[in-house]
Design a protein with these regions (language model features):
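C-terminal transmembrane helix and the adjacent membrane-cytosol boundary/short C-terminal tail
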Residues: 2-12, 22, 26-27, 157-168, ...
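Short membrane-interfacial helix/loop motifs at transmembrane-helix boundaries
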Residues: 6, 14-51, 112-116, 218, ...
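Cytoplasmic-entry segments and transmembrane alpha-helices of multi-pass inner-membrane transporters
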Residues: 8-9, 75-112, 168-169, 182, ...
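Transmembrane alpha-helices
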Residues: 11-20, 66, 96, 146, ...
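Membrane-embedded alpha-helices of multi-pass transport/permease systems
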Residues: 21-29, 70-75, 103-107, 116, ...
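Membrane-interfacial helix termini and adjacent extracytoplasmic/periplasmic loops
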Residues: 41, 106-145, 179, 215-219
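Interhelical loop and adjacent transmembrane-helix boundary motif
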Residues: 41-49, 53, 209, 213-267
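Transmembrane alpha-helix signature in integral membrane proteins
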Residues: 49-81, 178
């Protein structure tokens, strides 16, 4: 039976090798070689000149992740306290926008935020605006939050459904205020969901290029835009693009490692 179970893992192993390990080695190879295939570190030196773009990408990704967490935490708690049949209905509403094409959702925000769009029309009723909200960092963050907040809600909801409500009630019976219950009970016990949600939001946010191009215009280039330009744009250069991808991968892994270590420390404190 154990041998049979191991055989079931073979297709997954082959899939991981072909579509994860092999592409990773290809990226590393191109990042550390020039057009002739000779070893060089010039590509990494070139990437160092785009430090401001990396910093902007990290900043906007962190902001969008924090905003998603602030929105998703109360939503996840609210969903976890509903009856099971209502939970299913509300989860369907949360997931419904994810069924729509990513580009269409972003295009919709272009229309909403345009000078003649509904948002400026509502502001005009109050004698405000019109404001040029497109091609700004705020529009990029808004697009990230809208597209990725479901990925924060779902893991938080899953973690919170596992919290024994009697523990929360016991804390309140012992005189803990709502704020103290939140920070001493709910948040520590939701750390697994918070950690997963941060990873699921931060990784696509820091590497996005569609949202930054459509809502940020050319004035808010992110690292994803530069990588896309190196592989598909006029600046075609596989070696530099691979070096950028490699550096971004290292940054993401470091951030995930930090989140994972924080997760473990918090869980030890709870236990």
């Amino acid at each position: 039976m154990k041998i049979y179970d191991k055989k079931l893992a073979y297709p997954y192993f082959v899939w991981m090798v072909l579509f994860t390990v092999v592409p990773l080695f290809i990226v590393v190879y191109y990042a550390l070689t020039d057009s002739t295939g000779s070893f060089t570190l010039d590509n990494l030196v070139t990437v160092s000149g785009y430090g401001s773009v990396f910093a902007r990408s990290l900043l906007l990704a962190i902001i969008s992740t924090v905003v998603c967490l602030i929105i998703a935490f109360p939503v996840g708690y609210f969903l976890s306290r509903l009856r099971v049949n209502k939970q299913h209905m509300m989860l369907m509403l949360v997931m419904l926008p994810m069924w729509m094409n990513f580009l269409l959702r972003t295009y919709a925000w272009m229309g909403l935020l345009s000078l003649n769009g509904p948002v400026n029309a509502v502001l005009g009723v109050f004698g405000l605006g019109p404001y040029n909200m497109l091609n700004t960092s705020g529009a990029v963050v808004l697009g990230m939050v809208y597209n990725y907040v479901p990925y924060m809600i779902l893991p938080l909801y899953t973690s919170m459904t596992k919290i024994d409500q009697s523990i929360v009630e016991a804390a309140q019976d012992l005189g803990a205020s709502t704020t103290k219950t939140l920070f001493r009970v709910l948040i520590p016990m939701s750390i697994p969901g918070i950690s997963t949600g941060i990873t699921m939001v931060f990784v696509p946010a820091v590497s996005t290029f569609v949202i930054s191009r459509m809502l940020g215009g050319g004035s808010n280039l992110l690292i994803g835009d530069l990588i896309e330009m190196q592989f598909l744009g006029n600046s075609y250069n596989l070696n530099v693009g691979s070096a950028m991808s490699l550096v971004l991968m290292v940054i993401v892994l470091l951030c995930m490692s930090f989140t994972s270590s924080f997760d473990e420390d918090e869980m030890e404190g709870v236990s």
